[in-house]
Amino acid sequence: MNIIKCISLQTNYIWIIYNHIRQCIIIDPGESLKVIKMLNHLQLIPEAILLTHNHRDHTNGVFTLIQHFPKIKIYGPIETQNQNFATITVSEGDTLQILNQEIKVLNFPGHTPHHIGFYYKSWLFSGDTIFSAGCGTIQTGYTQAMYKSLLKIQCLPKNTLIYSGHEYTLLNLNFAISILPQDTLIINYLKKITKVLKKNKLLQPTTLQLELKINPFLRCNDINIQKSLNLFPKPGEEWKILQALRNKKDLYLVKN
């Protein structure tokens, strides 16, 4: 199986997986025009669309894709049922049989109430749950759910490749340094990424092994982060660190 990316709406990633006979799966098509052009250019035949959640920047392309490819099947969480297309509802415990491959569904509530991810071999399509050095915004009342979702990701094999829904790496690393200004690994990685982007090279995917080191949202038990926030939660309340980090990140985005 091969994977290619389609840049959409400035920061969105649409992922396309295809096999040796040019059949493909499209993940989170936020628009259709670029996807159709790419499919035509590579002579790919779409068999399925996978949706991680119901936000329009991940689903806007579905209706037009259905018109072009009427036999295509759409899989997504229950929250995608309210859109203008029919979806096969899936959740954790389901294994999709597509292109003679098995794709596992994982529940990642937090960014939205019924957000899901798709796990294929060592590839995780995480939607807006986790980004390189960051995580998605959290719906009100779902901080603890998001914390558990991030814990679930941390328990995956360390060689997992993470294909997320947006490219925010540079911004996320700068925020991480504002929390951990002495973290040499994050500082050096920011320098590396800055050079890559200056050469107009695209990023993604990242690895879980790397994210465990550079992503503050995966380090809620880290005493250095707790000191930076001046917040020392009781055992079992580490989600409060996630909440504090996300609040700071939201303010950081407003200022930057």
Swiss-Prot record:
Entry keywords, A to Z: Hydrolase, Metal-binding, Zinc
UniProt name for this protein: Hydroxyacylglutathione hydrolase
EC number: 3.1.2.6
Molecular function as annotated in GO: hydroxyacylglutathione hydrolase activity; metal ion binding
Catalytic reaction list: an S-(2-hydroxyacyl)glutathione + H2O = a 2-hydroxy carboxylate + glutathione + H(+)
Pathway note: Secondary metabolite metabolism; methylglyoxal degradation; (R)-lactate from methylglyoxal: step 2/2
Function: Thiolesterase that catalyzes the hydrolysis of S-D-lactoyl-glutathione to form glutathione and D-lactic acid.
Binding site for Zn(2+) 2: 57-58, 128, 166
Cofactor note: Binds 2 Zn(2+) ions per subunit.
Names of the cofactor(s): Zn(2+)
Pfam family, one: Lactamase_B
Keyword Plastid: no
Known partners and oligomeric status: Monomer.
